Amino acid sequence: MRNLVLIAGRPSHPPGQHEFRAGTRLLQRWLASVPGLSVNAYDGGWVPDHGVIEKAHAVVIFADGGRGHPLLEDDRLGDVGSLVRRGGGVGLMHYATELPVDAGAAEVDAWVGGHYEDRFSCNPIWNARFERFPEHPITRGVEPFETTDEWYINVRFAAYSTSHQGTRDVTRFWPILVATPNEKVRAGPYVWPHGPYAHVVAAAGRTEVVMWAVERPDSGRGFGLTGGHFHENWGNPQFRKVVLNALVWVTGVDVPAHGVLSDLELDDLRRDLDEKSTS
C-alpha cells in the first residue's frame, strides 16, 4: 500500500476561490477506489506530526504560497527533503507553486521541476484550451477540454530533458497541460501585481506549460499544477481526471488504463467549504 498525504492550506480568498479543504476532500473521496493507494487529507496548512511525512510515499500541497507558504515554517523543507531523498513524490497545486527565490525555490525546482516566480511569472485569469497531451500515465483517459482559471504563465523551469531515452541521470520533464494565451491575456491585467510585464507581452504566440510532471534520477516523481483557483472547476470531468491521475502517479501507483474514474453530484461542490465573509 502506497501512502499519499494531501495538505490543504488555511482559508483565504472569497468564497468559491482557494477552497483548499473542500478540494482536497473531494480528491480524497475520488481516490478511495484506486487499488494500492491510501490517502490522508489534512486541513490547516500542515500535518499534525513528523511521523505523517515519514510514513508517506508522496506529499501534495494545495495552499497559498509566496512568503506564507506552508513549507517555509519550522523545518518543513527539511521534512519534505527527507521524503525526497528516499525517493518520495511531491506535488504542488495552484498558489503552492510559488516560492520566493531566496526561500524554498531551489528545493522545489529540484523536487518538481519549476515554480512560480514573483514578477517573472504572472497570474491572469483566462480560458485555456487543452487539445493535445503527451503520452504519459497522467494523461490516460483525458480528452480535450477547456476551463477558465487563474492559469499562471511564464513559469520558471529548472533544467530538464524532454528526450526520455538514455536520460536516467537527469530529471525528465513532461509538459502535461499546454495552452496558448492570446495577446490580451498577456497584456493583463493580471490578478496581482496587475502588470503588464514587458517580457510576458513580448512572448506573444508562445505556448505555455501550466501543468507538468518530472521524474528525478532517483525515480522520485513530482508535478506542478498552476490552475485550481476556482472550486467550481472540479465540476469539469477532464480537469479532475488529469489531477487525480497526477496524484496516483506521483505516489508511485499505476494509473488505470482509462484514468481515474470519478462522479460528481451538484451538492458535492458545496460540501466542506471554508467559512468566509462575503462582504
Language-model features: locations:
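A glycine-rich, often tryptophan-bearing local segment used as a flexible ligand/cofactor-contacting loop or short
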Residues: 66-144
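Extracellular ligand-binding/catalytic regions of CAZymes and related secreted enzymes
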Residues: 1, 23-26, 33, 185, ...
